[in-house]
Amino acid sequence: MRACLSCHREDRKVSAFLRATHGREGLACTSCHGSPHAPAPVRLVRSRSFQREGAPVVGRHLKEERDELCLSCHPQLRGKQAMPFRHPVAEGAISCTSCHNPHLGGATYASTRNQCLSCHEDKRGPWAFEHAPVAEDCTSCHEPHGSVAPGLLRTAEPFLCLSCHVLPDDRHGQEIGGTRFSRAIYQRCTTCHGAVHGSHGDRHLKK
């Protein structure tokens, strides 16, 4: 760390890192970054990769390729990347650092939602009828690292919807669990309730 500070003392990312999750858990600069004077070629992230707050993600002197480096400490996420529905990290369209700033940490629900909406702007609203889980946190319904369900849902319809909408005293108080639909087409909630992120119509109906 001391050797790094000889060049990076004024870098705000360094002081932020020491206060953030990686720093508090005992990681040092050299946990991810090798020597800047090593004979191996320097690997840079794409110059167009920026964090939402405007600070460029400069992956200089990394020991491994960017995403492989993340997965070396977070191996549980490697399996998520093999699931049928996932963000295209393996294809190189985005990277771990497109959503996660390695020098910061401790994301709140609000910052997680804003991070998702920076790409999915059409889901932002404001809406006349808010869907409570969406207003709280996108990950109430979505598993961003990979899922077996379409749309990166945590589980398939209608089970995801029914995890909240069963009894009147449940979290969101919409009693629909006893409703019976005979035709298979009506066994998907989104057949009628398509505007699940929010709506200007009644109860998130499609029309």
Features from the language model and the residues they span:
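Short sequence/structural segments immediately N-terminal
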Residues: 1-207
